[in-house]
Each structure stands twice: as structure tokens, then as C-alpha cells.
């Protein structure tokens, strides 16, 4: 017993108690109500554990209850647990008796769950070797499948031969389908009804829905004989009644011959789509498919013209319920359509069928090998409101979260699945859930039972003396009062109560409207927001102001509606820090000397100042230059400043200090050029009161006075020298010009040559002129003749 208590002790300490007071705030007054709050809550049934008015304090986390003084034996805290009822080991190798095969473990268990908690269990699946196989060949016998029918006449022998390599226990059967024999799916003239192929012309069977022709048998020759006797039929529209046939083949277990301990393969062969659901309303058929077997004495579907086609959902339910694995062998045009169907139907596969079904044997073998390489779980039963999640642990321990399927498994390998189950509440009683591998008959049956009651509820003291003269029943540490009585111990009568003592003032509501008056004392209500307290329930710790959504800015405690700030914080919202670290500028001054530090932020007071530490101020004077008048006056006074210097320093807001003991790290170094061209250096610092102090004033690099005589002498000599140089240059230019002119003259004189002819300047004394009015001789003769 001691070891068990020790184990429970550590279990309680490890439970979730991260929400302080979260259980107590819900105000649970009974053990059952406490458990419904959450899996982290427990109830203390110890007598006199809390103040009579604090019944809800009994509901808390286990760790908090232990800290309050509740003994471990009185803590009611049912935990989720798994109780395995049946767990046979998985079968290994070949089994002589198929009934002894175990392919899933465990097989039966009870799962007790606290609402809000979860429990994880491991499920293992191993497909056994040489597992029996039942294969039912369901063929479309519409006219377009004529060549396919001829191809499979020897399929039975070939299929049995190939399957014998995979299993020693193989059976096969045969069935066929066409379409519902009603208009508009077929022609209704007497000739067309008797022979739907009369227009070809060709003799074929009348249209039929589904025929079960050969039950499952291990006689392959019998299968061949049956197939050879089959004839085609015909219908009008392209979709066929294949889903009607699948439904009957799945649910007519006895007539088909499905065994309990075998792999059920249904090979569906067609070259067309299938009708489903309400397609039959075109023929006036409105009765929903009931999902039951309706094969008559001739093994034909008797309700083909009465019931609708099954819906996809109905088909999935019946196929899964009867562990049937569908293999859709369809032509190229139909593959995409049936792949969509296969995605909805667990365990279904799709294979490409050649036009004449020439590859049907290889298609079946490949589909069988694919199905045997996959392990997939499916969940059946009452799962409404139940939360289940799966994690597949496949080859080499590889984890696949949120998956319940393992691929590329070899027969004999084990696939594990971690199944996590939880329930949200206690609204429903026990549920029955089944987890099984797709296509296999082995199942894991789970009874999910909610843990919503306490053991102490089974022990009730009616009219107990612990409840004030037997005025109530004592259960789980508290009293449930009889009618007419109330109070923690049923000590108060309802007809004698007065609420005056529970009012702060006569015009105030009882217990401030936030509590109940029991026997003249306020029992404050519990609130999910915090604690309500005070003699009149007038105080709480959650009605204070908030900053950025946080109570008292998360920097203080709410006491009776007012924020009490913690150290380092102030203000109504406790959002104002008293620290000035964030206000110190790079030069070490508070807000650069241009503002005040308010709530950890600089409030700039100088006009034009801005920035986090008021460091930017285009209109502000230079902090060094603004002290110039004080500094220069101090230097000119040779260390003995007068009243004029004191006024200038006071106006500049500085104090001159000769002390050498000061912090140079927080000081600002300044350099100014004085009126005498000297370099003035000094340090500026700020004391604790924010006053500016100047240290270490000094002058250096002062220029010497100029030598006037030497400057004048130098200037005079320079002027004289410049004049001489200019005169020399002028003389050189004139000489050069004269030389050039003389040379030119000499050159022209040497070229002159005087001739001995007439003087070109001489003019003769006689001049000859031509009379422009003179006429020629002919003209003169004419004139003379005229005169004569």
C-alpha cells in the first residue's frame, strides 16, 4: 500500500498544474463537477480541509492540494488507463489452421479516459504467410465485352496455377452484370427485349442486372466451363449497373461463399462507367438501396427494377464491413474515373485492362501483390465525438505522423501504429470502437469508457451528524443540504436568514452583488478573471486599469481595484519606469541637456530638439560654443573672475570647477578658438542635479605677434624687385622688336633691282584721244550722195 501511495504521489506532482488556481476559479461544488473542468483538476474529500465558505478550494491541481495540506489518500483524481483483455501473439510463418491465425494485436481492451486527457496505445499488424484467398471475378457482359469473354475462357486454369505460387488455399468464383432491365437503360420493344442485339444482327441474352453464376470453388476447370457458356447482352447508355453487382457480391456472403478467414478479392472487369445513387430516378425507381442481399432462387438480383443504385457511401460501408478488396480492371478511358473511386474505397486498386482483356492474369497478380504489400487501418463503430490520431511506424522504425498506412511491406513484417484517443466531455456513455486492417477479418475491439465520477461518491452518509443535526448528506467532504437548509454545514434555515449584515450600506446590494449571504456572512463568488474578496465582496484583483491589455501594465498588483506598482515603476497604469538609463545620450548627459526624462523616455523641452535622447536640434546652439563668453572671461581674469564673469557664467548656466576629482568618462570634451587665436580646451559634465560644470580650462597653441619692420622691409624689397624685373622684361621686348624690323628692311633692300628703261615716273607731253562721234567712210559717202 505504501508503494502505491508513493507512486500516486509522484503521479500527482507531475500532472498539469501550470494554470494557477485555474481549477478553483471554476467554482466546482461537487467532486463530479471538479473532474469535468479538466484532466489537471482533482478533488480533496478530507473532512474540514478548507474554511466552510471555501468549498470550491477543494478543487485544484494535485500538487496544490498537497501543498494546502490535503492527505494523498483523500485526493480524488482518476487517471486515464488502458486495460488489455485479450492479447494473443501475432502469428509467425505458415499456419495449418486458418482459424488460429492472428494478424493484429491486441485484440480486445478497455480504455478509460478522463475528459480532456488523451491515452496512446500501440497496435501491431503482421500479415501471415500462405493466407487463404477467395477471388470473385465480376464481369461486364455488355456487347462491347465480347472479345474479352473469349479471352478469359482458360483464365481459371492459368489463374489457379499462378496463385498457387502465392498461396496454397485459393478459390475463385464468377458473376456477371449488364444494366437494370428498364427504360431508358434498354429498348422496350418486344424484339429488343427478347434480343437486345437484334439490330446488329446478333443473338444475345436479354438485359439483366446481376447474375451470380459460380460460387467460390477450388475447381479451376469448373470455372473455365462456366465462362465458356456465357453469352453477352446489351443496353442503351454507356454507364453500366456495376455498382449494383458489387453490392450484391459483397453482402451475399453465404451464396458467394466468402470464408471468414481468407482474403476477399473482388475483380471488377468493365470498359464503361457505372451508375450510382439517384441515376435510377430516370427510370422512376425511387426506393433507396437497402444494402441487403436480394439474390433469388436463380441467383439473380431480384430488386434490380425496384431499388436505386447504391451510393458511393453505401458501397464503401458494405465493402469495408465484409472485408472485400476491390480490383478495378478497366480500359484506358475509364482509368482516371475509377482511380477517383479507389481513393474513396479503402483497399481498392485500379489496373489498366487491354481491349481484349489479354493482360487480365498479370493485372490480377500485380494487384494482389500490391495489396499484400500495404497495411492500412480503418476505424469502425461509435466514433462520434471521439478524437483519434494515428502515427504509423513502418519499415526500419520510420515514423509517419497522421498516417494509418504502411507501404512496401513484406509478408511477415510487422507494422506498428500509435493510436492516440481522447474525449472532450462526459455527455455520452461507453462507446464501442473497432480498429482493423483493411481487407482482413482480424479486429481490435475497444470499449471507451469515460472517467467522470469519484470513488468517494459511492459512500454517502444520509442525514449525517457532520451536517448540523443531520440537515444534509455528507459526501466527498462536503454537505448536500436537505430542502429548507443551506450553508456549508447546513446550519442556516432559509426562513430565518437576513441579508442586512451582508450589505456595506443599506442601499448597496447584498455582498456587492458578487457573493451569497450565508448565515450573515458573504461567500464571494468565484470568477474566471481572478479573486473576489472582502467582507462585502467589494474588492477584487482584476478590475484595475490595463495598459496594452495587461493588468497594471504587468508591472504591479491589483489590490481592491487599484494598481500597486512594483519597485521601479510608477503611474496610474504602472507603465512608467523610474529608471533614466534609456534617457542618457551618447555624450553622457540626460536627454542631451535639452529635455526631461519622463517614464524612461526623453521629453524634449528645448525648441527644435528631437530624437530619442533629444540629440537632434538644428536650432540649438553648440553646447561648447554657448559657454564661450564665460570661458573667455574666466581666462582673461587670470583665475580671479569678477562679478562680470560670474554673471556671464550664470547666464550660460554653467559653473567653473577647479576640482580634479570628477568622472572623465561621462564628460564632454570641447575645443574653441579664442579671440587671440589661442586654442581653448575644457571638459563639460553634469552633476546629479543636472547642472553643467566646466573643468580643466586651458589655452594652448597661441600664435606669436607679427614683426612689423621685417614685414615692411620685405614688402618694399618685393616691390623693388618686381619693378626691376618688369623693366628688364620691357627692355627685352623692345630690343627684340627693333631687331626684327631691321632684318625686314635689309631683306627688302637686297631684293630691289633698277632697270635702264624709261623712267616709270615719266609722263610725255603729247596725248592722243579718239573721237567717239566719228563715222566710217561708207557713212560719209552716203551723206555726200544725198547732198548731190
From Swiss-Prot:
Residues 131-371 form the VWFA domain. The chain crosses the membrane at residues 710-730. Ca(2+) 1 binds at residues 144, 147-148, 271, 355. Residues 1-21 form the signal peptide. Residues 456-491, 492-538, 539-575, 576-615 form the I-EGF domain. It comes from the Eukaryota. Disulfide bonds join 23-41, 31-454, 34-59, 44-70, 197-204, 252-293, 394-406, 426-452, 456-476, 467-479, 481-490, 492-519, 502-517, 511-522, 524-537, 539-560, 544-558, 552-563, 565-574, 576-599, 583-597, 591-602, 604-614, 617-620, 624-670, 630-649, 633-645, 678-702. It is found in: Cell membrane; Cell junction, Focal adhesion. Its main location: membrane. GO terms for cellular component: external side of plasma membrane; focal adhesion; integrin alphav-beta6 complex. One of its GO terms (molecular function) is molecular function activator activity. It is a single-pass type I membrane protein. The keyword Glycoprotein applies. Ca(2+) 2 binds at residues 179, 235, 237, 239-240. Glycans are attached at residues 48, 97, 260, 387, 396, 418, 463, 471, 541, 575, 696. GO terms for biological process: bone development; bronchiole development; cell adhesion mediated by integrin; cell migration; cell morphogenesis; cell-cell adhesion; cell-matrix adhesion; cellular response to ionizing radiation. Pfam families: EGF_2, EGF_integrin, I-EGF_1, Integrin_b_cyt, Integrin_B_tail, Integrin_beta, PSI_integrin. Gene3D superfamilies: 4.10.1240.30, Cytochrome c1, transmembrane anchor, C-terminal, Laminin, ligand-binding face of the semaphorins, domain 2, ntegrin, alpha v. Chain A, domain 3, von Willebrand factor, type A domain. The keyword Acetylation does not apply. InterPro entries: EGF_extracell (IPR013111), I-EGF_1 (IPR040622), Integrin_beta_N (IPR033760), Integrin_bsu (IPR015812), Integrin_bsu_cyt_dom (IPR014836), Integrin_bsu_tail (IPR012896), Integrin_bsu_tail_dom_sf (IPR036349), Integrin_bsu_VWA (IPR002369). Heterodimer of an alpha and a beta subunit. Interacts with FLNB. Interacts with HAX1. ITGAV:ITGB6 interacts with FBN1. ITGAV:ITGB6 interacts with TGFB1. The VWFA domain (or beta I domain) contains three cation-binding sites: the ligand-associated metal ion-binding site (LIMBS or SyMBS), the metal ion-dependent adhesion site (MIDAS), and the adjacent MIDAS site (ADMIDAS). This domain is also part of the ligand-binding site. PANTHER family: INTEGRIN BETA SUBUNIT, INTEGRIN BETA-6. Belongs to the integrin beta chain family. This is Integrin beta-6. The gene is ITGB6.
Amino acid at each position: 500500500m505504501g508503494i502505491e501511495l508513493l507512486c500516486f504521489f509522484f503521479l500527482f506532482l507531475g500532472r498539469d498544474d501550470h494554470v494557477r488556481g485555474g481549477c478553483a476559479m471554476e467554482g466546482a461544488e461537487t467532486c463530479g463537477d471538479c473532474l469535468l473542468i479538466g484532466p489537471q483538476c482533482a478533488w480533496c474529500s478530507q473532512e474540514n480541509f478548507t474554511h466552510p465558505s471555501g468549498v470550491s478550494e477543494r478543487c485544484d491541481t494535485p500538487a496544490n492540494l498537497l501543498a494546502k495540506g490535503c492527505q494523498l489518500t483523500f485526493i480524488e483524481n482518476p487517471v486515464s488507463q488502458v486495460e488489455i483483455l485479450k492479447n494473443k501473439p501475432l502469428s509467425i510463418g505458415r499456419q495449418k489452421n486458418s482459424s488460429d491465425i492472428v494478424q493484429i494485436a491486441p485484440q480486445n481492451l478497455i480504455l478509460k479516459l478522463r475528459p480532456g486527457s488523451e491515452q496512446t496505445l500501440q497496435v501491431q499488424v503482421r500479415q501471415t504467410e500462405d493466407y487463404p484467398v477467395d477471388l470473385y471475378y465480376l464481369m461486364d457482359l455488355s456487347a462491347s465485352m465480347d472479345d474479352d469473354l473469349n479471352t478469359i475462357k482458360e483464365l481459371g486454369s492459368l489463374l489457379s496455377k499462378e496463385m498457387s505460387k502465392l498461396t496454397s488455399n485459393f478459390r475463385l468464383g464468377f458473376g456477371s452484370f449488364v444494366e437494370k432491365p428498364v427504360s431508358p437503360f434498354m429498348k422496350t420493344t418486344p424484339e429488343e427485349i427478347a434480343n437486345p442485339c437484334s439490330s446488329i444482327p446478333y443473338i444475345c441474352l436479354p438485359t439483366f442486372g446481376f447474375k451470380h453464376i459460380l460460387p467460390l470453388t477450388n475447381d479451376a476447370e469448373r470455372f473455365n466451363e462456366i465462362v465458356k457458356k456465357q453469352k453477352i447482352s446489351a443496353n442503351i447508355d454507356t454507364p453500366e449497373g456495376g455498382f449494383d453487382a458489387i453490392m450484391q457480391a459483397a453482402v451475399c456472403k453465404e451464396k458467394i461463399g466468402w470464408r471468414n478467414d481468407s482474403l476477399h478479392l473482388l475483380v471488377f472487369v468493365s470498359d464503361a462507367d457505372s451508375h450510382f445513387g439517384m441515376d435510377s430516378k430516370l427510370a422512376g425507381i425511387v426506393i433507396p438501396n437497402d444494402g441487403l442481399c436480394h439474390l433469388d432462387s436463380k441467383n439473380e438480383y431480384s430488386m434490380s427494377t425496384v431499388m436505386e443504385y447504391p451510393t458511393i457511401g453505401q458501397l464503401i460501408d458494405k465493402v469495408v464491413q465484409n472485408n472485400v478488396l476491390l480490383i478495378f480492371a478497366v480500359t484506358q478511358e475509364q482509368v482516371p474515373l475509377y482511380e477517383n473511386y479507389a481513393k474513396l474505397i479503402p483497399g481498392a486498386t485500379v489496373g489498366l485492362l487491354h481491349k481484349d482483356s489479354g493482360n487480365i492474369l498479370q493485372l490480377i497478380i500485380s494487384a494482389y501483390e500490391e495489396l499484400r504489400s500495404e497495411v492500412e487501418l480503418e476505424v469502425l463503430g461509435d466514433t462520434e465525438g471521439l478524437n483519434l490520431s494515428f502515427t504509423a511506424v513502418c519499415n526500419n522504425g520510420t515514423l509517419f505522423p497522421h498516417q494509418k498506412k504502411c507501404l512496401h511491406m513484406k509478408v511477415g513484417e510487422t507494422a506498428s501504429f500509435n493510436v492516440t484517443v481522447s474525449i472532450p466531455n462526459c455527455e455520452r456513455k461507453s462507446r464501442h470502437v473497432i480498429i482493423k486492417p483493411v481487407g482482413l477479418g482480424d479486429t481490435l475491439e475497444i470499449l471507451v469508457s469515460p472517467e467522470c465520477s469519484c470513488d468517494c461518491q459511492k459512500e454517502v452518509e444520509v442525514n449525517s451528524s457532520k451536517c448540523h443535526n443531520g440537515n444534509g448528506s455528507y459526501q466527498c467532504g462536503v454537505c448536500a443540504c436537505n430542502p429548507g437548509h443551506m450553508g456549508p454545514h447546513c446550519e442556516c434555515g432559509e426562513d430565518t436568514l437576513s441579508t442586512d449584515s451582508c450589505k456595506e450600506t443599506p442601499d448597496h446590494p447584498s455582498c456587492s452583488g458578487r457573493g451569497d449571504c450565508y448565515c450573515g456572512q458573504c461567500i464571494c463568488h468565484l470568477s474566471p478573471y481572478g479573486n473576489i474578496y472582502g467582507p462585502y465582496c467589494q474588492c477584487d484583483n482584476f478590475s484595475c486599469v490595463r495598459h496594452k491589455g495587461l493588468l497594471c501594465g504587468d508591472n504591479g498588483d491589483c489590490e481592491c481595484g487599484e494598481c500597486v506598482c512594483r519597485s521601479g515603476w510608477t503611474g496610474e497604469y504602472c507603465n512608467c519606469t523610474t529608471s533614466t538609463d534609456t534617457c542618457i545620450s551618447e555624450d553622457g548627459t540626460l536627454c542631451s541637456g535639452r529635455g526631461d526624462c519622463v517614464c524612461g523616455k526623453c521629453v524634449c523641452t528645448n525648441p527644435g530638439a528631437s530624437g530619442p535622447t533629444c540629440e537632434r536640434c538644428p536650432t540649438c546652439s553648440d553646447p561648447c560654443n554657448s559657454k564661450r563668453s564665460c570661458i573667455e572671461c574666466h581666462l582673461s581674469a587670470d583665475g580671479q573672475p569678477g562679478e562680470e564673469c560670474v554673471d556671464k557664467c550664470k547666464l550660460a548656466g554653467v559653473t567653473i570647477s577647479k576640482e580634479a576629482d570628477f568622472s572623465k568618462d561621462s564628460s564632454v570634451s570641447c575645443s574653441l578658438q579664442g579671440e587671440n587665436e589661442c586654442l581653448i580646451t575644457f571638459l563639460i559634465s553634469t552633476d546629479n542635479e543636472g547642472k553643467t560644470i566646466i573643468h580643466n580650462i586651458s589655452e594652448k597653441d597661441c600664435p606669436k605677434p607679427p614683426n612689423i619692420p621685417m614685414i615692411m622691409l620685405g614688402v618694399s624689397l618685393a616691390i623693388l624687385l618686381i619693378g626691376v624685373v618688369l623693366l628688364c622684361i620691357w627692355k627685352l621686348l623692345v630690343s627684340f622688336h627693333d631687331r626684327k624690323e631691321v632684318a625686314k628692311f635689309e631683306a627688302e633692300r637686297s631684293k630691289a633691282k633698277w632697270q635702264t628703261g624709261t623712267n616709270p615716273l615719266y609722263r610725255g607731253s603729247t596725248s592722243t584721244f579718239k573721237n567717239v562721234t566719228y563715222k566710217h567712210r561708207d557713212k560719209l559717202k552716203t551723206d555726200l550722195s544725198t547732198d548731190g
